[in-house]
């Protein structure tokens, strides 16, 4: 399993970014900078820049967090059982650095039927047209 990013990264993360990526926290719903992003491009892990999701797989699930129906590649993310909060969920972590991203649920659209519910605070986005980077 991949390790968390170097300790020096902690100094660069905001409190909410640290809470989400390093402590498996959750940002408040409808608060993330990338929730309503409609631009074409790639969503990366905030901690290591691993490509995680393509904009073409993003959809509005109404849940308050960016939602995607599949990762960019098979090994972009890893899955862990999460039995916290008296429920069973599947946690999603970066496949490269192990940063917490969010959870995946079996109620998404086709072609996968999955909904990757991802914290904006765990992501950065690179616009494919301008190269501009936005940090969630």
Curated annotation (Swiss-Prot):
GO terms for molecular function: peptide-methionine (R)-S-oxide reductase activity; zinc ion binding. Residues 6-128 form the MsrB domain. Coiled coil: none annotated. InterPro entries: Met_Sox_Rdtase_MsrB, Met_Sox_Rdtase_MsrB_dom, Mss4-like_sf. It holds the Pfam family SelR. Its EC number is 1.8.4.12. Zn(2+) binds at residues 45, 48, 94, 97. Its cofactor is Zn(2+). Binds 1 zinc ion per subunit. The zinc ion is important for the structural integrity of the protein. It is an enzyme of class 1 (oxidoreductase). It catalyses: L-methionyl-[protein] + [thioredoxin]-disulfide + H2O = L-methionyl-(R)-S-oxide-[protein] + [thioredoxin]-dithiol. Keywords: Metal-binding, Oxidoreductase, Zinc. PROSITE patterns: MSRB. The keyword Membrane does not apply. One of its GO terms (cellular component) is cytoplasm. The active site is at 117 (nucleophile). One of its GO terms (biological process) is response to oxidative stress. Belongs to the MsrB Met sulfoxide reductase family. This is Peptide methionine sulfoxide reductase MsrB. It comes from Photorhabdus laumondii subsp. laumondii (strain DSM 15139 / CIP 105565 / TT01).
């Amino acid at each position: 399993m991949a390790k968390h990013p170097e300790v020096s990264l902690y100094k660069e993360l905001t409190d909410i970014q640290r809470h989400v990526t390093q402590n498996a926290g959750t940002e408040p719903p409808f608060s993330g900078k990338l929730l309503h992003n409609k631009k074409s491009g790639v969503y990366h892990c905030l901690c290591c820049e691993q490509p995680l999701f393509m904009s073409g797989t993003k959809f509005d699930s109404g849940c308050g967090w960016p939602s995607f129906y599949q990762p960019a590649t098979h090994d972009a993310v890893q899955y862990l059982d999460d039995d916290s909060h008296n429920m069973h969920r599947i946690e999603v972590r970066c496949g490269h650095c192990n940063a917490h991203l969010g959870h995946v649920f079996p109620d998404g659209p086709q072609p996968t039927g999955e909904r990757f519910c991802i914290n904006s605070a765990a992501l950065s986005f690179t616009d494919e047209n301008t190269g501009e980077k936005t940090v969630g």
